[in-house]
């Protein structure tokens, strides 16, 4: 393939590999910086949308490191970051960055926080990395290339009965919304194995991908929360959609081991009917 000026362009697979290499390098650098900083102590913690929606100096420093790294490696790409990064581009590639997904866990020194970097083209996620520094775990995927944990292939669980499913979810920063969501879960918790709440969407998606949980659902997220994780889950054989089974979107996402998607979708939809 050649560009208009005659230069050879990378194939889709080559491009995905290049994007993955950039993302992996930057996720490791940013995550290790944040981990070292957390061990040294936090000095600048502020609130965002609510009194419980936090941002630390390391959220911002991580995003700056990643944005500068992407701009140096791929200056024509667009970038969108949780902490305000917004760079327009001309290449057709857009990066979605969550510099620390699970900031509350980071604040409390719980290990379930991650750096999430996804690169998308017009067809959706093309390459994704979720790095969990406190666990030393790097989840990676490229479109059509499979999903990996520290270089080893991963796949979702082979579970067929939703009553045996360990299900993860997340709750809103809004107290009113949290109450509605908790009531919803209470309506079907007796019909599944149990509920877990990790506190980081990117990690939840990766844990479905590698079989540590069987399903994950949440609402009112952003593209930077799910861009990398949903690709990793897809490449690991998971099924994703909104709660009713249509195209997954940040406003509403359900990702499961493939055989239980419809069963869990029905439980969530039935439980949600009572709060509308």
Annotate the PLM regions.
Residues 51, 135, 247-250:
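Short acidic/glycine-enriched loop/turn segments that link adjacent beta-strands
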């Amino acid at each position: 393939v050649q560009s208009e000026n005659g230069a050879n362009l990378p194939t889709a697979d080559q491009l995905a590999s290049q994007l993955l290499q950039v993302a992996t390098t930057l996720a490791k650098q940013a995550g290790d910086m944040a981990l070292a900083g957390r061990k040294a102590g936090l000095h600048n913690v502020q609130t965002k949308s609510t009194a419980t929606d936090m941002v630390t100096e390391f959220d911002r420093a991580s995003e700056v490191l990643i944005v500068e790294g992407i701009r140096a490696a791929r200056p024509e790409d667009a970038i969108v970051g949780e902490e305000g990064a917004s760079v327009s581009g001309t290449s057709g590639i857009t990066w979605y960055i969550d510099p620390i997904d699970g900031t509350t866990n980071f604040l409390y020194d719980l290990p379930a926080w991650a750096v999430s970097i996804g690169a998308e083209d017009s067809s959706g996620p093309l390459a994704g990395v979720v790095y969990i520094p406190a666990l030393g775990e790097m989840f990676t995927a490229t479109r059509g290339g499979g999903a990996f944990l520290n270089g080893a292939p991963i796949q979702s669980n082979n579970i067929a009965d939703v009553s045996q499913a360990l299900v993860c979810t997340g709750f809103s920063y809004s107290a009113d919304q949290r109450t509605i969501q908790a009531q919803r879960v209470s309506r079907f918790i007796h019909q599944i194995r149990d509920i877990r709440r990790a506190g980081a969407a990117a990690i939840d998606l990766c844990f479905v991908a590698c079989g540590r949980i069987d399903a994950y659902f949440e609402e009112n997220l952003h593209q930077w929360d799910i861009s990398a994780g949903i690709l990793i889950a897809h490449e690991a054989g998971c099924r994703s959609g909104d709660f009713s089974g249509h195209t997954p979107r940040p406003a509403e996402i359900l990702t499961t081991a493939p055989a239980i998607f419809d069963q869990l979708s029905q439980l969530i939809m039935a439980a949600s009917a009572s709060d509308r």
